[in-house]
Amino acid sequence: MKILVTGARGFVGRNLVSQLHNIRDGKARNYGIAGEELTIYEYDMDSDSAELDVYCRQADFVFNLAGVNRPQDASEFMKGNFGFASTLLDTLKKHGNTCPVMISSSTQAALDNPYGESKRAGEQLLFEYSRETGAKVLVYRFPNVFGKWCRPNYTSAVATFCNNIAHDLPIRVNDPSVVMHLVYIDDVVDELISALSGREHRNGDYCEVPVVHTITLGGIVELIRSFRQMPGTLSVPDLSDAFTKKLYSTYLSYLPEERFSYPLKMNVDDRGSFTEIIRTSDRGQFSVNISKPGVTKGQHWHHTKNEKFVVVSGHGLIQLRKIGTEEIVSFEVNGGRMEVVEMIPGYTHNIVNLSETEDLVTFMWCNECFDPARPDTYFEKV
């Protein structure tokens, strides 16, 4: 299959082409499309017009993502959105190519402004082309699209907010109560790739992305600002919420390189170190413990607190004893055969580094974040 993508270097185009390349190269096998049969033609505003002629002669499917969003003069809307679509369709007709054609429109096509009028004209042109040639056409009226690689301080509020907050730049919100309808770029790309196989989602004359998120402008800003504070608190978002998960990924894509990493507080003593990595309100705390050769750590028990230990490097011994009894349960552990050892409430426990030369590195999960006011930790040797 030969696929033509116009506007290939735009926001949606770049993401679509990237995933089509993954399919072609055998890296994305979840779409049911034979990648070795794909040829991808990329066309953009600075491409040679002769290339468009060649591509339109050979294409088996066309994604027309080219368009103008923010010209210097309003008259350019019609030229960029209607004019190019007309050129594209005329070129297909010249070669008698009636392959399916998808066009990227906007929910603003219903509005009476220069942008909406140009999009609506492009839609009607495509519908007329279908009636004239019998070609299958797919008109997608996208709401606001967000995700990685979207240009900030241009037409996308989400991209601007993510970029500016990530860079500690000011933002302006005129009305935080404005309701936004958004689709995520990965959902858009998945829908467009489904359309290749005739599995598009239709709603009357139009096609649509089935997953739409609705949230106020103020809610978006509040979430992004919370993301900015998370490295300092070691927290992570509520990823059970689909929109939050997608917005967090989008926010991270705008981080300046100097914020790709951030320091952790290592609690160091002569026995080794203990370092918290992630703290959550409902999934506990994740930490790394390092014990020096021959060192024993722990020797305490908890009423409610429970933990999971995984030795990832070194050779150690984990021991547990139920309070009020003398029987000791022992687990010899090492990084070459990882396993989870549960620290059970009501059992005093320790972890011993059996090596004389190597550190013992243990990944630890605890069901609650440490609270110095209620540590629930009581010393007692195993």
Residue map of PLM features:
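N-terminal Rossmann NAD(P)H-binding glycine-rich loop of SDR-like oxidoreductase domains
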Residues: 1-26
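NAD(P)H-binding glycine-rich loop region in Rossmannoid oxidoreductase-like domains
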Residues: 45-83, 87, 91-95, 108-111
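Conserved Rossmann-fold NAD(P)-dependent oxidoreductase catalytic core, especially the SDR/UDP-sugar
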Residues: 86-123, 130-133, 138-140
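Conserved beta-loop-beta element that borders a ligand/cofactor-binding pocket
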Residues: 124-149, 162-163, 169-178
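Substrate-positioning beta->alpha
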Residues: 152-160, 177-197, 218-222
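Mid/C-terminal beta-alpha module of Rossmann-like enzyme folds, strongest
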Residues: 194, 198-265
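A short glycine-rich, His/Asp/Glu-containing loop-to-beta-strand
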Residues: 260-299, 305
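Double-stranded beta-helix
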Residues: 325-327, 352-382
